[in-house]
């Protein structure tokens, strides 16, 4: 405001001086003392114009003389899916449209998903909470790949009443389930910077998805049950021919050069997911593998048959891995999935059949009126 006042005062002073000079020239002309006709008329007019413009700029709201802004094209929703299509996560370039603080939080959340071990692993820079795997090892492409165990329906379906715990669970509780089971670690503080960042990322991914809606392509594809039990021996053959190049002959995975995390995760052993993880259920592991493994596979162009997929799942989940106390799981045992491998059950099928199948007879039992 101060510079505007200074300009107005300066223009007024100039106007006064010009009027004085014009009057002086007029007197000199009348007495014949001025040989040529001199007038300040045009200078005075120009100064008045400048004064009016300056006064208008000073009094009118800021931006009154600016050209009308051009409205940007409306941004499509973050969620990119249609009823007849598949959900996939948005391009992170869209984060630039958010305020700086929220953008930074979401980007940090995404980085925690892709490089979990660097922050929370055995040598993590923030804490030492997990087994060295990354969330992205199971939730592909930072949880955005169709049928890649993605996060597309997390925000729309939580809080969620889950049969496994028998409780209404928040997003934070679901994240910590993965921390304690898939990453075989300990829970994050639910109000920590890291948890808030992960939740913000999941909320952003779920933008535009209606509450309680589950778009096609979210989570893991459901495969039809085999009419036989899945066979670990056949699965070993599949593993040897299709999986060893990335996961190693002993399923140990491949570490990054700096030893901070896994490029390809261990499929069993002390650094793999424990027996409480979702992928320890054969249907979950098989559906995940079918659409995504080996490298280069997609849901449209799988490289394994359904039988190979079920068998390799049986082989991997027959190998040793960390245990977990599951006594608090499935308080209503009638709600256990058909492929939950630990009793007790309300049916009479064995734990072995619940683990490897055939599953159709078990499913039929629970469908009886």
Please name every model-derived segment.
Residues 119-122, 145-147, 182-187, 205-218, ...:
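Inter-heme linker and motif-flanking segments adjacent to c-type heme-binding CXXCH motifs
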Residues 86-126, 207-239, 253-255:
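Electrostatic cytochrome c docking/interface patches
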Residues 130-143, 198, 235-254, 267, ...:
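The canonical Cys-X-X-Cys-His
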Residues 241, 245-246, 251-253, 262, ...:
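C-terminal cap of thioredoxin/glutaredoxin-like
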Residues 103-108, 112, 116, 137, ...:
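Extracytoplasmic electron-transfer domains, predominantly the class I c-type cytochrome c fold
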Residues 1-121, 163-167, 173, 183-193, ...:
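N-terminal export/targeting leaders of redox proteins
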Residues 128-129, 149:
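N-terminal juxtadomain amphipathic helix
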Residues 194-201:
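An extracellular/luminal cadherin ectodomain-centered signature
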């Amino acid at each position: 405001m101060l510079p505007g006042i200074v300009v107005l005062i300066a223009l007024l002073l100039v106007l006064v001086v010009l009027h004085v000079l014009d009057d002086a020239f007029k007197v000199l002309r009348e007495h014949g003392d001025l040989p040529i006709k001199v007038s300040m008329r045009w200078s005075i007019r120009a100064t008045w114009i400048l004064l009016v413009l300056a006064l208008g700029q000073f009094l009118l709201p800021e931006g009154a003389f600016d050209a009308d802004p051009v409205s940007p094209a409306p941004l499509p929703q973050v969620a990119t899916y249609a009823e007849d299509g598949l959900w996939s996560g948005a391009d992170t370039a869209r984060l630039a449209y958010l305020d700086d603080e929220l953008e930074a939080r979401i980007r940090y959340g995404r980085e925690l998903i892709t490089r979990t071990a660097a922050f929370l692993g055995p040598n993590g820079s923030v804490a030492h909470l997990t087994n060295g795997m990354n969330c992205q090892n199971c939730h592909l492409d930072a949880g955005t790949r169709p049928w890649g165990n993605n996060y597309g329906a997390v925000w729309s379906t939580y809080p969620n009443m889950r049969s496994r715990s028998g409780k209404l669970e928040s997003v934070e509780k679901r994240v910590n389930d993965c921390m304690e089971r898939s990453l075989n670690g300990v829970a994050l503080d639910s109000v920590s910077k890291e948890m808030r960042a992960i939740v913000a990322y999941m909320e952003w991914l779920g933008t535009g998805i209606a509450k309680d809606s589950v778009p096609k392509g979210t989570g893991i594809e459901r495969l039809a049950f085999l009419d036989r039990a899945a066979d670990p021996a056949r699965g070993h053959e599949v593993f040897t021919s299709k999986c060893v190049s990335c996961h190693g002959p002993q399923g140990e995975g491949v570490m990054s050069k700096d030893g901070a995390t896994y490029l390809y995760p261990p499929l069993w052993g002390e650094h793999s997911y424990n027996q409480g993880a979702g992928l320890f259920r054969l249907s979950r592991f098989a559906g995940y593998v079918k659409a995504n493994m080996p490298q280069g596979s997609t849901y449209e162009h799988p490289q394994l048959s359904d039988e190979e997929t079920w068998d390799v799942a049986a082989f991997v989940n027959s190998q040793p891995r960390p245990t977990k106390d599951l006594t608090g799981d499935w308080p209503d045992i009638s709600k256990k999935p058909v492929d939950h491998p630990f009793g007790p059950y309300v049916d009479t099928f064995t734990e072995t059949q619940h683990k490897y199948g055939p599953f159709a007879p078990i499913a039929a039992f629970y469908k009886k009126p």
